[in-house]
Amino acid sequence: MDAEIFFNPYLHTKRSRRDWRAEPAADNKESFLQIVPRGVLYDGATGLIKTQCELSPRMFFEDREYVLDPVMVWPGLDIAADGEAVPPCDFVFHTFDQVVSLVFAEGRGRARRWRQHISPAGNVIRLFGATALGTPVCVNVFGQKSYFYCENRPGEDLRDVIHDLADASRSPGPLSASPSRRAPLVAVRLRPGDIPHLYRVSFNNWSMARKVGALMVQEGRRAYEIGVDPLARFLIDRKIPSFGWLRVGRFSRRCNGQTSTAVIELDCQVGDVVAGQPLPNWPPYRCLSFDIECMSASGAFPQAEVLDDIVIQISCVCFVVGGSGAHRFTFAEKHLFTIGSCAPVEDVWVYTFPSEYEMLLGFFIFFNRFSPDFLTGYNINGFDIKYLLHRMCRVYQKDAGRFTKLRRGGRFFVNSPDGSGDAFGGRSGVIKVFCAGTVVLDMYPVCSAKTSAPNYKLDTMAERYLGQRKEDLSYKEIPVAFLGGEEGRARVGKYCVQDGARQGPLNVIAYHYEAAASPNLARIPLRRVIFDGQQIRIYTCILEECSARGMVLPSLPSSPPSSGGDGAGLEGGDGGTAGRRKKKRSGSAPDGEDEDDPEGGDEGENGECRENGLEKEGSQGSASGNVGYQGATVLAPECGYHHNPILVFDFASLYPSIIMSNNLCYSTLLVDGSPPVPDEDVLEVVVGEATRYRFVREHVRRSLLAELLVRWLKQRKLVRDAMKACGDEKQRMFMDKQQLALKVTCNAFYGFTGVAAPMLPCLPIAASITKIGRDMLLATSAYMERHCNDVEFLVSEVGVPREAVDRDALRVKIVYGDTDSVFVGFRGIGREVLVKVAGKLAAAVTRDLFRDPVRLEFEKMFVSLMMICKKRYIGKVYGENKLCMKGVDLVRRHACAFVRSIVSEVVDVIFHDEAVSEGAMRLSEMSFEELRRQGVPVGFFPVIRRLCDARDDLFLDRVPVAQLVLSSVLSQDASRYKQKNLPHLAVYRSLVERGEELPGVGDRIEYVLTCPDESKKRAPNYEVAEDPAHVREAKIPIHAEKYFDQIVKAVTNVLLPVFPKDMPRRERFFAYVLPIRTYLPEVFLRMSKEDRECGAYLARESGLGMNSFIVYGEDTCGSRVGEGPGRGEGLGVGGGEGTRPPRKNGHARLVSGCLYGSRPFNKKDRFVTLHIE
């Protein structure tokens, strides 16, 4: 450890080392804080070396020294595609990202042609993209005005009003106010005609326009569309796709004074850009996937705010998305940035740096030189990007914005949920990343939204989508390996690179193609599709339609103006900053689990509120919270097990079809002050007891929303038809993403009108949609029960063969109804017949009850259905072997493997064994009194038997310890927990006492529940938790009773609908029916033949049978004591010596009061006697 193994030129200068806390030297040289892990100088050493360095930052690659400079040629990157010819006019390129900059005319190099648009300051829209060959392009669009509409009071000079509202120290700059003829969206509130005294106010400066508009609304003036930024105006007014091909007619190419890193940079005016051909193909875009590794000086989970919690390695993987395979740049695929010397890593370019700052600087220079169009990774929004930006911008006080595609005015920042306001139309609670000219695609929120999995660790997703498992390296091993020497750093580097290399899910899920299908429909940038919800999409769609119709949208006092979420900023302004709140990541995955209790409470039964046979789905409210309306309808479910055909019908595009068929819209709503309309021209919707909403009919005024929906649904149908005829797999994928974008946007209209804190709220529309949908569901249910119980209707209208109907058994009943679906149970008609005629039945309902385009469709048929409660059911679909589950987790996510397997087996046998299915249905139809008299149906015995077998396996120690392991995350240092009585903390303390290797913060601590002393039978989990390795080594018996209790609770939670509805304490069902078995220590099992015969004699003489005298276990020969061939065939007791309890009507007799589990054994007794009352 004495020999220095890594030469650091900054630590070997002849000058004395300066104190790192000292102020930088007062000369022209720029110094920086150098933080170096001591272990890169001395193998195995811990701690950090800090010094203030005045030399130039540098890196080492393949025994060569490089001085780090933002304009350096990076080794391994050859992407400066040169020589692509630029035509004198009609330049065609593909755009993927747009940024709005506020530019000042004082800047040098401004041609007079462009200066007029930015004097003294003006908007410039940067269109980033690429040519067909992949050459980077940036087009600077000048002349886009920021404007809104407002009503001027008679006798006022609008210009004077605006100057008064503007800051006294700042002029609003050039502005124009011209009369405009526009109608309001809610036009029926006024007399026919345009808004009187309406003016369009235009500014060069977007920030000033936003400020003045907001102040007008605050003063009570009527203003319209004040929150629409210049980029949205450009895309909507010019019909420009935000992700697609564009053509620039006239332009001038910048050869000097470029503001971007693009190879081709053009200047043009707003009228020079037009939409190109709507081709689905992309040019080759550069994508960068990266991952970081950090090291905490305290051993806790690294935090960027802590000076000593440094970044030690960064991996980058470069690849191309889109294109046909031909492009004009080449580059190495895998790169590793590391502090200290590093052994070679196969197929990886390794760059070594003397300190953290130099490594960060090297990474950002590499990022700038590679200039990725897409930045991806796993949980990079919540951790990696935030960490890098905080270290670079806050710790080292360097501007990260200058490494983006904009040389001046670039911004690179993270907007955390606790930030100071989201952009207009943004989603709260979403971490947003802005990087000028680069679209960020974090695959963690994508995978968590599109995948149902026990956890969303990268390893789990990679195994799911790629069939790969990574070489795992725990957090506690990373610092040791990194500080151990070159080979250790290479091992950490290989681990880091493999995380960055797993961009496979991006290609498998193809989310980048899905996201790219939405911008053109909504006229919003791709980044807003990714980070902002549906609100902004619907708003811009309505805005575009209103603009085409000569209408304006109102601005609400509570609506915040756009905060520049699309990149409005100052050229030459300060750079981006990192997010203010750190989102912790547990372990090596961002799933954020907290301490888990494997014995958590059971889910409740049916606690929903019911009213007139309906269950309230919930309520929506206005932003103020004082007005609400009842949410979607849920018909009260027939809870239980249904082993008869259940037809499921649903409405196609329910909410869009309601809007279209009933002509609902802002523009058709009659409000106070509306002109009188004849009753026959009005649709009246009664909501509640006294609230009435009125909308004019289609022949009076056509709904704007309806026309949008009709257009999009027709377009979606054309796309779906084209998919069927398309033979190109890639084109089919493009089309599929396009039709999905149309579907999602159509379905979002309902939420747009009624969601809390909306952009354009209209409670009457949302409440009317809900009420009409509720009436449709009730009408469908009544129609089904009234007509389908009539044989003649089934034969004549639906086409059911007369001989296929069992008149005596025919019974049709609504089992469940939920928003847009109806579950109809049929008896007396075979499954095959029902499947054939279900479509005709749906058509008959549509024809008799609804107007076009409302359409009821047959979705599927359940052969068996276990209805647990609303929105929770399990069913077996006709023609499929896989079970359909909704709202049901068979077991808690953190249950052990053995519990999960038993619950799955029980559910499978109920749905796939015909006899068990019949038994379950019979049991669900029984009353508690019938159950007491007749006992559990014979068909249900396999379930009882499987639970008994599971209990045997636990008590007889036949379950491997690995299947009984539970785990919880150590989310912080063990000493910082306020609650000490947690199982995983108890295991941690045990490891400390035994001097074993301790887990680190973020690791999952595994534990097993062990058998306590006889005096602590009811000991809590933290008293019996133990490390699995120690349990195996010391052969400690497990706590079989606790594990079996978990099984019983989990099975009961799932099978609750099967138990008699009037049974008291249904959750105790298995306590009543499972036979008692007492498991004896081996010393008591060595019984002679005479002992056994004596027990049999006592059983016969008592008249209770051997079932009441249960001594259960295994003797030395492996045979079971107290058990005969009839084991498990009885109810409430285990069979013994071939005897079975008396039966009546094919059922075993139910014996009340039996208990399950173990009990203390009395040494004086040969048998444990169960007295039955």
Swiss-Prot record:
GO CC term, one of those recorded: host cell nucleus
Q: Where is the composition biased (Basic and acidic residues)?
A: 607-618
Q: Which GO terms describe its biological process?
A: DNA-templated DNA replication; viral DNA genome replication
Q: Where is this region: Disordered?
A: 554-625, 1123-1144
Enzyme kind, highest EC tier? transferase
| Superkingdom | Viruses
Its UniProt entry gives the catalysed reaction(s) as: DNA(n) + a 2'-deoxyribonucleoside 5'-triphosphate = DNA(n+1) + diphosphate
Q: Which UniProt keywords apply?
A: DNA replication, DNA-binding, DNA-directed DNA polymerase, Host nucleus, Nucleotidyltransferase, Transferase, Viral DNA replication
GO MF terms listed in the record are: DNA binding; DNA-directed DNA polymerase activity; nucleotide binding
Reported EC number(s) for this entry are 2.7.7.7
Q: Quote the subcellular location field of this record.
A: Host nucleus
Q: Where is the composition biased (Acidic residues)?
A: 591-606
Record flagged with keyword Transport: no
Segments crossing the lipid bilayer: none
**Major localisation:** host cell
Q: Where is the composition biased (Gly residues)?
A: 564-578, 1123-1138
- Write down the SMART domains for this protein, in alphabetical order: POLBc
Task: Tell me the Pfam families matching this sequence.
Answer: DNA_pol_B, DNA_pol_B_exo1
Similarity comment: Belongs to the DNA polymerase type-B family.
Which protein is depicted? DNA polymerase catalytic subunit
In which organism is this protein found?
Rat cytomegalovirus (strain Maastricht)
